Design a protein with these regions (language model features):
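Alpha-helix N-cap/helix-start motif at helix boundaries, enriched for small hydrophobics
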Residues: 96-100
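Membrane-interface helix-boundary motifs at transmembrane edges
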Residues: 9, 183-188
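Short helix-to-coil transition segments within interhelical loops
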Residues: 88-94
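Aromatic- and glycine-rich beta-strand/loop motifs that create alpha-glucan
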Residues: 1-21
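Secretory targeting signals
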Residues: 22-78, 103-181, 185
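Central hydrophobic cores of alpha-helical transmembrane segments
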Residues: 17-23, 190-204
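Hydrophobic transmembrane alpha-helix segments characteristic of membrane transport
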Residues: 82-85
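Extracellular/periplasmic helix-loop-helix junctions in multi-pass membrane proteins
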Residues: 207-214
Length: 214
């Protein structure tokens, strides 16, 4: 597992996935920040609002399956085409090989996406004012009372919200990484490995299952 993870973090795919996540988040927050450049700092959005805005209103979630698949799962296609998979399973066992590949894919996808969100949040906590609705009423976020973030965002400048979203992103990316790994095994093609998970998410997000089955 250690060697697999080292190869994951050294791979250009991992860094491309992390950069795509970061640029997607920045695409929303930077545009919103530049659009309010004429306003006083205390009347602009807080660091928390800018940090999570791209998740709720930007395209981050649409690209999450793509980035999760790209981080490591696509390497499975190379191992199959080069007969490396057969050699590695002969050295150990199929079960151990599957566990290592699945674990590395999940960890690689989680680290790539989580690190992008964390770096994005750090950047905006340096540039913008931390979330403090008591001092700055404009920092108030109107979450629904049933939402878990309703009371959390006022605690320690929204730290519980940052932590929960970070864990949620990592868990979601891990799930999509396993889906992509399964695609890579059944259909050993890099393009399909990254596009099929994205397509499945698009169908799920569009409520296609509800449309057909009610």
């Amino acid at each position: 597992m250690g060697e697999e993870l080292r190869n994951t973090f050294r791979s250009s795919r991992f860094w491309i996935a992390a950069c795509v996540c970061l640029f997607t988040l920045m695409g929303y927050s930077a545009a919103y920040w530049i659009g309010s450049v004429d306003e006083w700092l205390e009347y602009r959005e807080s660091a928390l609002q800018l940090s999570i805005g791209g998740i709720f209103f930007g395209g981050f979630m649409l690209l999450l399956p793509f980035c999760a698949a790209l981080a490591h799962s696509t390497s499975q296609v190379e191992e199959e085409s080069g007969s490396i998979m057969q050699w590695r399973t002969l050295r150990s066992s199929v079960a151990k090989y599957v566990a290592i590949k699945a674990g590395a894919s999940m960890i690689g996808a989680a680290v790539a996406t989580m690190s992008a969100f964390i770096l994005h949040a750090i950047i905006w906590n340096i540039i913008a004012l931390p979330c403090d609705p008591t001092t700055y009423p404009n920092h108030t976020i109107y979450f629904d009372p049933s939402c878990i973030f309703y009371n959390w965002y006022t605690i320690c400048y929204g730290l519980p919200v940052y932590l929960e979203i970070t864990v949620g992103i990592g868990f979601t990316a891990s799930v999509w990484a396993v889906v992509a790994l399964a695609v890579a095994v059944w259909i050993p093609d890099k393009l399909l490995t990254v596009t099929i998970p994205s397509f499945l998410y698009y169908l799920w997000n569009a409520d296609v299952i509800f449309f057909f089955f009610g």
